[in-house]
Amino acid sequence: MTKNNSLKLGYDYDAWHGYGQRDVLFTDISLKTNSHMILCGMSGSGKSYALVWCLKMLILASPPEAEYFFADFKQDDSFAFLRGCTFYYPYKKSLEALEVVYTILHKRQSGEDKNRYTVTLIWDEYMANILALQGEDKKKTADVMNKVSEILMLGRSLGVRFICSCQ
């Protein structure tokens, strides 16, 4: 496969239903153009499948030194193939993935880490994780949301990307 920064999102709904045309929708997934992503949909709509596809395309489009941290709050079988990986954080450990990526962001911001290869935090069922955490510890929930906000605001220029799925 060749390196390609285009990610197929699906088809233009209006073109299909209005005119019977199958117009493909793409987005550029290079860090300079599209640093963060959110995949939303109803239960059973294919968000986890789309996240696997997105991960595949990111890996194919990225340099070999790029790192991916996968927080899998739902921990169903969709990402079972990742369970043996070092950068896979299931269910209750999903917050550890955030801490690792947040530390990388701050080391880069302070100049301690001069690297700018892409570091991506992929978080499946982010909002479900936040809501579950909120029921346990509101202060920790606020801390998590602040860290995610910081990654979203500062990440692009430091080579740190956030991708999540939610309902």
What are these model-predicted stretches?
Residues 2-111, 117-120, 127-167:
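P-loop NTPase catalytic phosphate-binding loop
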